[in-house]
Amino acid sequence: MDLSTLEQKLTEMISAPVAALGYELVGIEFIRSRQSTLRIYIDSEDGITVDDCADVSHQVSAVLDVEDPITVAYNLEVSSPGLERPLFTAAHYLHFVGEEVAVVLRMAVQNRRKWLGVIKAVDGEMITITVEGKDEVFALSNIQKANLVPHF
């Protein structure tokens, strides 16, 4: 099973239990390595505490133990999205129009995979980012990773 299919299956599997606890499932990442990690990002209107993460971890662990979708050993991490919030869906980009974002593409555009710019617009599955005064349009399916860039 390829990584995006696994992440999609995991998202479908744990969305309801996370929502039942009163949290939004922001997204998940599965990082394959010698010590693989399943990272789950949650949020709520009141913010996220360590106890919230522990509650979700306990609930999700129970679901994953029964369903057993991951065939390798892994560590489970549950956290808030944090200041460098990852963006997973078109709705996330739409919510953060006007914010600076760092994007890594699956396939290079204009010989570049890494882009830094401001989210300008979202049209279906197409994301427009203003980079150095020029609008660049990327398919959401070509975005491997995107994070907000915090300013202090």
Swiss-Prot record:
InterPro entries (alphabetical): Ribosome_maturation_RimP, RimP_C, RimP_C_sf, RimP_N, RimP_N_sf
SUPFAM superfamilies from the UniProt entry: YhbC-like, C-terminal domain, YhbC-like, N-terminal domain
GO biological process: ribosomal small subunit assembly; translation
Gene3D superfamilies named in the record: Ribosome maturation factor RimP, C-terminal domain (2.30.30.180), RimP-like superfamily, N-terminal (3.30.300.70)
Cross-referenced Pfam families: DUF150_C (PF17384), RimP_N (PF02576)
Record's GO cellular component terms: cytosol
Highest taxon, organism lineage: Bacteria
Annotated keywords: Cytoplasm, Ribosome biogenesis
Main location: cytoplasm
Cellular localisation: Cytoplasm
Family: Belongs to the RimP family.
Cited function: Required for maturation of 30S ribosomal subunits.
PANTHER family: RIBOSOME MATURATION FACTOR RIMP (PTHR33867:SF1)
Protein name in UniProt: Ribosome maturation factor RimP
Species per Swiss-Prot/TrEMBL record: Pectobacterium atrosepticum (strain SCRI 1043 / ATCC BAA-672) (Erwinia carotovora subsp. atroseptica)
